[in-house]
């Protein structure tokens, strides 16, 4: 968690401008916004308290449209801070929700606004959409009627210090306006409010404003959804730092509840050029765990989710301040949660279902920024709940947003057990046992030429037979090879160790060429051998292992997480023998 605090607000500010808030309440606020705008642009009848001509009191302002405001109209760029005291929040959510506030900031580079909750500068952010809606609520406090010019008992309207919501609006020029928000009127359509400001009369005497107002219905709607709401309703439900879709991930790791890593991916740029030959040019990530595989196109499309990785609503923010010094001697702080709060959302340590960690860059020169999220299991209400370690929040998440949590590991990977282009195969060896017990083993040596930035196989020779074979049927054989696909995970109770002590049912070896330095491979390429071994454990299924052997003798691989269909191996064995014998055969796509 310590490392997750090493970040700057400017990083997020550069990306928040791409986000569209998903919280349902903002839709309501947007409607309210146009109601407020309409009130400012249309002529309305001036509020009156008697049949006599309405007279403005000190501090009140009438705008050109005819609307009358408790204090002057404010633009979003005028705002510096908004501080709110709402004692009613203590009973429903706790003491930390009573006093809260928003700091407004402006990013000169991006020409966009962003903000954060005061006291949570590195945790709780608001994007420009939310700030605009909030600013509209406090910037145009329109009243429909002045109830009383001088009030002697504010408690009648819920405007006494003990019960009212107190809002303090601080401007960039240092001016401050204070507004108290009390009860709703009997019909429930409008709030009673009063100003907490001091004004000066025409004689130069200063006094506290004591008038009580009834807000317009549009302003009431806005206030109810922002100032009078819980602070969590205004927060951007980000689960992690946004990912630049053009750069993707530098790391991606998904763990199960028991701490076992289900998937670990790295970008193709992080592996050797020789390894890339086995992935072709279409994959974006290769697997560190399970090793030897490449990411599937199904996962690649999920990068769009992480560009704006959000839930639907912030439910809680951390209230327990934790401070300390990290291993580098730097001070850190973060806000943690009480155990009962975590338990409420299925996020206590014994019930966390998934842990997701990834890192990403915002540009090529930037240092990768780490994100970490803990997920509950799917809860009875039909949602996941996520604990963001970056933002110290608990967020409600629609299952559609994180559908990949329910994937099997194989769903993240390419189905093809062996991805390699025919032009990058210098030597292909096939070894298997026929039904009569005889063993077939042959190596096919391919000669390739560079043509239009691609190596094209021109001829192929069977090594043992010492015979040149048909290129047409070599291509058919290679299609059979690439059609061997992963079909699922092997049973958890399978004794893989004992199985792999036996002779493999089938074996495939592919060795890439050694390429000298050229325009296509400026640094040259050493040869790499990829070995697939298949161990049959039922009549129709065979466990597959992957081993990569580098030119320097070092190896890496994966020991049997998935299975393939034996029928596909049998077809390849039969066709390889027909190929050597000069017999006709054809690729069969279906198993």
Spans of features found by a protein language model:
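Soluble, acidic/polar mature domains that operate outside membranes
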Residues: 2-591
